Amino acid sequence: MNEAIKITNLKKSYDKTIALKGIDISIKDGAFFGLLGPNGAGKTTTINILTGLVNKDSGETKVFNKDTEKDFRFTRSQIGISAQEFSQDWFFSLEKLLYFQAGYFGIRKKDAESKVNELFDKLGLNEKRNSRLRQLSGGMKRRFQIAKALVHDPKIIILDEPTAGVDVELRHE
């Protein structure tokens, strides 16, 4: 089986604070993988480097054997991320935001319609599709983050603190 993610000797510092000190990770295609550690251990920094949101100091990061910096568009097309922080798109409805997210990946509204409807249904967001993010509870915002991560059918799903703010019943679902 091919490697979906390969990280070799990854290093990152913020001023004099070392965030990542030569980490190595190999994740096979189709595998479930958890990155665990205390606050400040570098989990989110690793995710942000992998998705191109933060520049690494050194090391190698690959997605399906393609360099994440050289093949940024490919990398972004393969990864869906539900970030730890909520997006700040307060002015548009959830439905519009999901269509915008699909458009970011080159999916036309007409082509995205069935996927958007499916995600609203599966994540229990149908009644909220015309709501604004500012009107949602933390758990509902988290569900919407997951919908955004899935709208372009990525091969890799990254969930950064996916159960924060989610009630116990939904965690089991």
Question: What does each of the following model-derived ranges do?
Answer:
Residues 59-70, 74-75:
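Conserved ABC transporter NBD signature motif
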Residues 99, 103, 110-128:
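Conserved ABC ATPase "signature" region
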Residues 157-160:
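Catalytic Walker B motif of ABC-type/P-loop ATPase nucleotide-binding domains
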